[in-house]
Amino acid sequence: MTSTFLRSFVLGCLLISTSLFAAAQRFRAIVPYVNEGGKLIVSLKVNGQQGRFLLDTGAPCCVSHEFATRIGLKAGEMRTGEDSNGRAVQASLVSLDSLQLGAVTFRNIQAMQWEKGNPTAQLIDGILGYNLLRMGIVKWDTRQRQFIFTTLTEGLGLDPSRALPLLPNDYVPMVAVRLGKTANDTVMFDSGAEGFYEMSNRQRERLTKSRSTARILSTADGTLSMGASGIEGVTTKHRILIPQMEIAHFRFADVATITTDGTASRLGSQLFNYGDVAIDFPRRTFYFLPHPAQKEPLKVYQPEWEVVPTITADGTIVAGIVWNAKLPICQGDRIVEINGKRCERIDFAKAVSTPPFLLSGKKTEIVFIPQGSTEERRLTIHCK
C-alpha cells in the first residue's frame, strides 16, 4: 500500500445554480485524462486559454484566483457553501464566456473562484463540476483513459443490469448502495475524492443501532483530510470493515472505510480501478460497468498504517491519527524523519502537487518528537 501526506484532498461542494447551456442539443466530447494520485485531470480551454481541470462530480465548476486573473475574469458576488468536511467556505461567483472540452464549446458557464493563494492552484487551474456535467451523460472509460461527455447513448456500452436510479438531489449524483444483506447507505459519487468508500458518521450511527455485520476495527481522534476550507479539525474517526458491499448489483468484499464528518458518505475514484462509471443525468441513472476480469465478490481490503502522517499549514508533519493506542506516539506529535529522509519543514503549497514522502511496504521507521519535548524517538510502524 502507498500512502501520501494527506489521506484525501477533496475539494468542497458549493451549491450554485445550473449554468446556462448554449451548446448544441446533440454533442459528444471525448478527451483523454490523466490520473495523478487518484485525481482525474483533463485539459480544456476557458475563454480560449488552456488549463488543467479536475473532473469532480462532487463540486461545481471552479477556477483558481490565479487562472481567473490570467484570463481576465472579474469576481462577482460571494457565495457560501460547505466543504467535504462539512465546514463553511466562501467563494466568488464568476461567469465563463466559453469552455471548450474536446471539439465541443459551452457558453456562459457559472463557476466559483477560489481565494488567492489556495494551495490547490499548485496542482490544477480549476474544476469541471456538476453544474455543467449534469446537463448530459458522462462516462469514464478507464481502459482507454478517456472522459466522455455527451447527450448520445450510442456506443457507451451502458448495461441496464449494472444500473442504479439516481436519488433526488438538485446538484450531486446520489445512489443507494447495499451494506451486507439488510443495511443500505445513501452515497454521493464523488469523482474528485481519492478513496473507494468513505462512510459518514451519520451512517455509522445508524449501523450501530442495527444488526449489521460491519465491524469497527479501531477508533481514534485525529485529522486526515483537507477540504476547500483547509485541513479539517481533530475529530473522532472509526475504521470499519464491511464484509460485503453491493454497488449497482456488483458485490465487493472486505471493504475497509474510515468515517468522515461530511454530510454524506462518498464513493470515490478508486472505484475506477475495477470498472467504468457512467452517469446519465437526464435519465437519472448511474452505471458501474465492471471490467470483464473482475469476479464477484471482489475483495478490496486496504491495509492502513498504524500512524498516518499529515502535513500542517505551517509546513511541519505530525501524526494525523494514531490507530494503535499501544504505540508511544500521540496524535499531534511532530514527525521529523520517514524512511531515513528528514522532513522537518515542508513547503505546503508544493506538497499539494508533489507529496514529500511515500509510505510503502508493510513497515517503516519514523522519527518523532513528543509534544512538550525536544527528544527525538525512533519508532517502527506497520501497515495492516
Model regions and ranges:
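N-terminal signal peptide c-region/cleavage motif recognized by signal peptidases
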Residues: 17-19
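Bacterial N-terminal signal peptides that target proteins for export
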Residues: 1-13
